[in-house]
Amino acid sequence: MVLKIQRPSTGKKMTVKVQRKAIQMPYLPYYGMQKDGIGYINYNQYLENSAKDVRRAFIDLKKQGMKGLVLDLRNNGGGSVQEALQILNMFIPKGRHLLSMKGKVKNANSNYNTTVEPLDTVMPIVVLVNEATASASEITSGTLQDYDRAVIMGTRTYGKGLVQIPNVSLPYNGKLKLTTAKYYIPSGRCIQALRYKHTDNGYVAENVPDSLTHEFRTAAGRIVRDGGGIKPDIEVKPDSLPNIAFYLSRVDTTDIMLNYEIDYIAAHPTVASPKDFELSDADYEQFKQRVVKSGFTYDQVSEKILKELESLARFEGYYDDAKPEFEALRQKLKHNIAKDLDYPYNKQKIKELIAADLMAAYYFEKGSLENSLRNDKQFAEAARLLGNPTEYQKLLQPKKEK
């Protein structure tokens, strides 16, 4: 394949020959040692043979003096159950029950135990999860929770507790995803969040209400519940993305942020390492001026709420009396892009987004992930917890009943 390329920064035209071939993306986008002996492994998909890379990464980090591990399963939608079982074999003693699959017919039933001696049964572990952590990731995090082998931190997981056969061929090029069983982790719970109810209009999916969930116990006696995914031992919500940052990075069709980043790369052949890189205030000021001059606008949540309030006031008959106040508030909330970009929280989050993009360009996904840990609230809390052994161990013990 021959590509013709023109560099925006120089206007130079080039011809590049590209050889097409199958590319194997890394199973682990990034792993490495962080401050104070904390190891970090980012695992984004349970692909075939990926557990071997997790194993190698863990061994490497231990050789570097790791004192505690953060296993990041955020946004990991799962994959091969066998890979999940191999990872659990690394941390749970041989002969322990890991997983049961139960279907409506006997040949859909199966049980899985650990089959080899573990690599480590004492290393403190924090598993980071979120609402996009699903399937095999939930088997891993839920089983580690059931054996009190790790502290689960973040937000509640997706809740996919079904065993499915994908891509069953049907006539006329049809495909079917067939559910054959549910899976149950060691405490006996199924973490499936949706139940399917038969109605006159067919099957309807609905969330399992908390009142219908059941209580189970971990190996140490801690209370856990089924339904609704894996509830973390410590809930830590991520920082929210400001509206202006969302529009600049994901909605803006003029690509102001992307074009700024392209120009930045052209002007900076080399930059600091991902662990140290931060967009300077001077560089951010250049970006801000570019945004202001472009005429960029975005929808403010406060303006939307004001319109809804005005509509409600009209409906209730109060609008005419309050009209001057509404108009004054509208003027107060009027767009001031420069002011919005200078607001400290907005500025910080936009700088982080630009830095992550730049690190991906200079150092690929590995660099972007390493840089993002600098401002990752959930990772920071995980590292803090691993640095406090007494607090960590207390979380893995059952609460004293009053």
Which residues are covered by each model-predicted region?
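Residue-level detector of alpha-helix boundaries and kinks
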Residues: 39, 72, 172-173, 205-206, ...
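Polar, glycine-rich mid-to-C-terminal structural blocks
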Residues: 136, 148-149, 153-155, 159-222, ...
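Short, charged low-complexity intrinsically disordered segments located at boundaries
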Residues: 88-89, 116-123, 172-175, 317-322, ...
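Short, intrinsically disordered/low-complexity patches at protein termini
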Residues: 38, 64, 105, 123, ...
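Stable alpha-helical elements in mature extracytoplasmic
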Residues: 50-57, 83-87, 94, 136-140, ...
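Conserved functional hotspot residues or short segments at active or partner-binding sites
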Residues: 190-402
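Cleft-lining beta-strand/loop regions that shape enzyme active-site pockets
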Residues: 1-169, 182, 371
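Short, solvent-exposed loop/turn elements at domain surfaces
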Residues: 25-27, 48-52, 186-187, 224-226, ...
